[in-house]
Swiss-Prot record:
Name of this protein: Amino acid oxidase fsqB
Organism: Aspergillus fumigatus (strain ATCC MYA-4609 / CBS 101355 / FGSC A1100 / Af293)
InterPro entries: FAD-dep_OxRdtase, FAD/NAD-bd_sf, MTOX
Pathway, per record: Secondary metabolite biosynthesis
Catalytic activity field: (2S,4S,5S)-2-amino-6-(3,4-dihydroxyphenyl)-4-hydroxy-5-(methylamino)hexanoyl-[peptidyl-carrier protein] + O2 = (2S,4S)-2-amino-4-[(3S)-7,8-dihydroxy-1,2,3,4-tetrahydroisoquinolin-3-yl]-4-hydroxybutanoyl-[peptidyl-carrier protein] + H2O2; N-methyl-L-dopa + O2 = (3S)-7,8-dihydroxy-1,2,3,4-tetrahydroisoquinoline-3-carboxylate + H2O2; N-methyl-D-dopa + O2 = (3R)-7,8-dihydroxy-1,2,3,4-tetrahydroisoquinoline-3-carboxylate + H2O2
Induction record: Expression is positively regulated by the fumisoquins biosynthesis specific transcription factor fsqA.
Length: 497
């Protein structure tokens, strides 16, 4: 089967924009029609460049870029993407190197995994990290207790210094390791830059419009394009649905992705405080036991706190041999959002001057802020029993203690788009020949692969059309065959539809 003569890509996010970029760089598509559709106007009048949607998921100020995964294929992809983040994609401070402190709770990292321990997720990631890191295990620093973690951060032990320390490797404790091969990216700036690159290459027609429905052939066996809400019809040989949280709705497959929101909070630092943390080579903090992470200081001198997505929590608990059911308020509940024009575009949440959520009828927000506060106090808070009796051994770090108790200055919602298998869906829809391709289900981590996900998607588009000549460069892992299986379309969902 020949390569498509025309494309419609629905969605100018991670999957869609990166695919448009890959097509623009490939001479085989120099004379092909490529249309990129998004309901957000990235190039409004009088703008000097592209402007990202400030409430979209990809508007994040500091998205974690890590290669530390407990799953080999994603670890390999992240390692490949990291090279690009440290090159062209990360120029002009779009990417910032920051080491990662990756932790969980349970027995020592030097012992085998045990059931019901979240540190299993860390142990698996640690083993892969040792394989990928030059120098192996000797080059990866292990922090095998909460006290070691706090000491690494420059804080005092979590217990009064005159009490004995439990060194039992089987005891439950916070344990982790430090990876130097990580950082964060200004996601909004990255999307704006990539959009400008696509426009500069001049091969893609960008259309502002919201897709109302797919357009089918008379016999319903092929997709001919899309119809916009204003009635305009766009046609192409291949339609690619990469619409993020709206993909399930456009495709009419509610259970393809679970769409929901979580809360992100920020603490403002002074310039002096932020500079001091940078001087200390402050790490990204990830505690998979609490399901909480902290990134920064960012370019605005803020620390950002977020929750793992539900899929991320499920992934951690699976490694602990704990089975978790589908979210009880999952797929069906999302339907009420489809008519809301703000759907999947996040949104600000009002907070008081003291950092409390103004909407006191929002228990989810209150729980999120409580989780972040506990996370902070555990790592950065003052030593227990300080102020009672520390036998004159008080060595508390006022900077860290102050941050641990500081009000949150900003809270926002961000949307997640999880697949049941917790893997992306990058494959042809099986019901329409080779006329409808799906690229969605970012599961809270697709942005890490922004520099390479487009070329992988294009390779799968061509390979699955029967082009046996399509391959990745020698030595690149995972192979196209592995990706094709990992990101296959879940045909079983069509039986329930």
């Amino acid at each position: 089967m020949s390569i498509p003569n025309s494309f419609i890509i629905v969605g100018s996010g991670v999957f869609g924009l990166s695919l448009a970029y890959a097509l623009s760089l490939d001479d085989r598509f120099a004379d092909k029609k490529i249309i990129l559709v998004d309901r957000w106007n990235f190039e409004p009048p009088n703008a000097t460049g592209s402007v990202h949607n400030p409430a979209a998921a990809n508007a994040d100020t500091s998205r974690v870029i890590r290669r530390d995964y407990p799953h080999g294929p994603y670890a390999s992809l992240a390692l490949e993407a990291m090279k690009h983040w440290r090159g062209k994609f990360g120029e002009n401070n779009r990417y910032v190197n920051q080491r990662l402190l990756f932790s969980g709770e349970g027995s020592s990292l030097t012992t085998p995994p045990k059931a019901l321990e979240t540190v299993n997720y860390i142990k698996k990631a640690y083993a892969i990290s040792c394989e990928l890191t030059p120098g192996g295990r000797d080059a990866v620093q292990v922090l095998d207790s909460l006290d070691e973690v706090r000491a690494f951060l420059g804080n005092t032990p979590s217990h009064p210094p005159h009490l004995p320390v439990n060194k039992d490797p089987a005891a439950r404790d916070l344990r982790g390791y430090v990876s130097n091969d990580c950082g964060w990216a200004d996601a909004g700036a990255s999307i704006e830059w990539l959009r400008q690159e696509v426009l500069r290459l001049g091969r893609v027609e960008c259309v502002v419009g919201e897709v109302e429905s797919l357009v089918y052939s008379d016999d319903q066996r092929a997709v001919k394009g899309v119809k916009l809400v204003d009635g305009k019809v766009l046609t192409a040989e291949l339609t690619v649905i990469a619409a993020g949280a709206r993909s399930s709705h456009i495709l009419g497959i509610p259970k393809l992705c679970d769409v929901y929101s979580e809360f992100v909070a920020y603490i403002q630092l002074t310039k002096e405080e932020a500079d001091e943390l940078r001087r200390r080579q402050w790490p990204i903090l990830v505690n998979c036991h609490r399901g909480v992470f902290a990134v920064g200081p960012d370019h605005d001198n803020c620390l950002k706190f977020g929750h793992f997505s539900y899929s991320g929590i499920v992934d951690v608990l699976r490694e602990a041999s704990i089975q978790v059911p589908t979210r009880p308020d999952g797929w069906e509940a999302q339907q009420k959002y489809w008519s809301d024009p703000r759907f999947a575009f996040g949104g600000e949440v009002k907070v008081s001057a003291l950092g409390d959520v103004d909407d006191y009828e929002n228990p989810a927000a209150q729980r999120a802020l409580a989780d972040y506060r506990l996370f902070l106090l555990e790592l950065l808070g003052p030593t227990g029993l300080q102020g009672v009796d520390t036998l004159g051994l008080d060595q508390s770090d006022n900077l860290l203690n102050n941050i641990a108790n500081r009000p949150f200055t900003r809270v926002r919602k961000c949307w997640y788009n999880d697949t049941p298998a917790l893997d992306f869906v990058v494959d042809y829809h099986p019901s329409y020949g080779k006329t409808l391709f799906v690229a969605t289900g970012g599961c809270d981590h697709a942005f890490k692969f922004l520099p390479i996900i487009g070329e992988k998607t294009l390779a799968l588009i061509l390979r699955n059309r029967g082009d046996s000549a399509v391959s990745l460069p020698a030595g690149v892992e995972p192979s196209l065959e592995e990706l094709s299986e990992l990101w296959r379309f879940p045909v079983e969902l069509l039986q329930d539809n």
